Amino acid sequence: MPYRAPLDDYNFLFDHVVGLDKVRQTDRFEDASDDLTRAILTEAGKLCEEVMAPLQRAGDMTPSYLENGVVRTADGYANGFKAIAEGGWIGMSANPEFGGMGLPTTVTTAVNEMMSAACLSLQLAPLMSQGQIEALEHHASDAIKDIYLPKLISGEWTGTMNLTEPQAGSDVGALNSKAEENGDGTYRVSGQKIYISWGDNDFANNICHLVLARLPGAPAGTKGISLFLVPKYLPDENGEAGVANSLKVVSLEHKMGLHGSPTCVMQYDDATGWLVGPEGGGMAAMFTMMNNARLGVGCQGIGAGEGAYQHALAYALDRKQGRTPVEGGSGTIVDHADVRRMLLSMKADLFASRAIALSCAVAIDMGTATGEAEWKARAAFLTPISKAFGTDVGIEVSNTALQVHGGMGVIEETGAAQYSRDVRVTAIYEGTNGIQAMDLVARKMMDGGEVANGLIDEIEAHAEAARDRFPSMVDDVWQACESLREATDWLTSETDLNQRFAGAVPYLRAFARILGGHMHLAAALADSTGGKREKLARFYIKRLMPEYVGLLAHAQSGADDLYAITVEELAS
């Protein structure tokens, strides 16, 4: 079925749930009026429905390939990217000084989710550029900004990030790539990088790589890593793409999904690069890009889930099988209780994860606009939750959508299986979801749980405002908050990080589950008619949110039983 952008959900969330009004009240974003954001979402929806969605199957059926050292993309991808670039969608939140729109990240987040639902493999290209733009805005010299930012924002050039090496995956500090100073302000960069999304393409005039490498004499580990900007073509005196640099695409990976997106093995052989940020400051600079990408990847999961849900719903409304168990039913499988359960679970989880991601974006915008540490800390706390829960939901919804299709779900022609194949990697790249959870219970709780407990307090206060209308749901949310607070206290009092890490994933999931209940309750409160928002909230809070009980028990179980079984016993 054709993709339809869920504009009603975005506008409802902006107006009633995530607090975009606070962002609009700041001096920085005062021009982001309701009329403007609605118009932007409408135009983005048209782009996704009419231009990007038709490319979804094309990229899957005709994967990118390498020809004479150049990546060739599926038919229509070049025109699709051109439409994205010409519409200004790459630079939505970028600095207007360099050609960006200067819009709130919250609006960009909604648009990125729509693009991911329409064609995830193509959306990866502008997402990588957006992350690089933000990293350069924060860390690059003025000379680099003046040359590269206008080109990246316009889409004339595209950007990538190069972290991973064969021996250095999650342990980035183990990388071997090196850089040596040339004496003229440039550096010679050498090494091999793997898993580079959109490491090359056939529609941009230049591809700009952000590469992590180590300078001579630099300390071991992440403290010795620096960041370099290494373009495919060196800019000439006019700032245009000039002579070829000493780098190449060695090969493309043959992947489970995302066939339209080239995943490259990159080789740098004394390639010319420029230092971004200070020597040894590579991880700090790269994390700017990665945090941008982590929220974006969470939205990729949600977007893929939305596309899968729409496919499943259309199939359920059309497929007739068995006798309808409800009077006045449609006669299709949507009448069957288990199918209805699956559809409601998908819809409720998508709403919850979407609301969490947009709330994270609001915190980012408020931190940017006000400079207040409280907002920045909240954004940092919500980022791993948004990434992990958004991608988990995307995977689960895509799998459930396939189940709704029955046997037709595994027949490629229906398109249902593609969502499952495409979305699976989102729980792995930009930091696995396990690493997101470890980050949450370690770095993000170095404040003794201040941000976590502040969020719990806020959920309880907002729930109390709904008690007169929804006493039963409010009681459920309150009980969940008390259990979450207890688990938070246990984690923050545990000094052995490995004991925390053993329960990190279930803790993150439980926090997201309860945040989702908070978002649904806020939606129900804003739905004065007792309509679909209230009904969906009741379904989520009564049927899905209770998962937190087992999760929090797991989160507080420690690590001892994990190591009670020996490696030999695991293999026996």
Regions found by a protein language model. Give the residues of each.
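Glycine-rich cofactor-pocket loops
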Residues: R28-D31, M61-A74, A285-G296, Q310-K347, ...
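Alpha-helix capping/hinge segments and adjacent helical runs
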Residues: R4, R188, L258, S359, ...
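A glycine-rich, basic-preceded beta-loop-alpha segment at the flavin cofactor/substrate interface
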Residues: Y195-S197, L234-V250, K255, P262-A293, ...
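C-terminal amphipathic alpha-helical interaction region
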Residues: F98, D447, E458-S572
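A short core secondary-structure module
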Residues: T186, S190-A244
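Amphipathic, small/basic residue-rich leader segments at the start of a protein or domain
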Residues: M1-Q123, I147, S557-S572
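Flexible glycine/proline-rich, aromatic-decorated loop/lid segments
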Residues: T108, A179-N182, G257-F287, R319-G331, ...
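Internal maturation/activation junctions in enzymes
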Residues: S64, Y77, M128-S129, A140-S177, ...
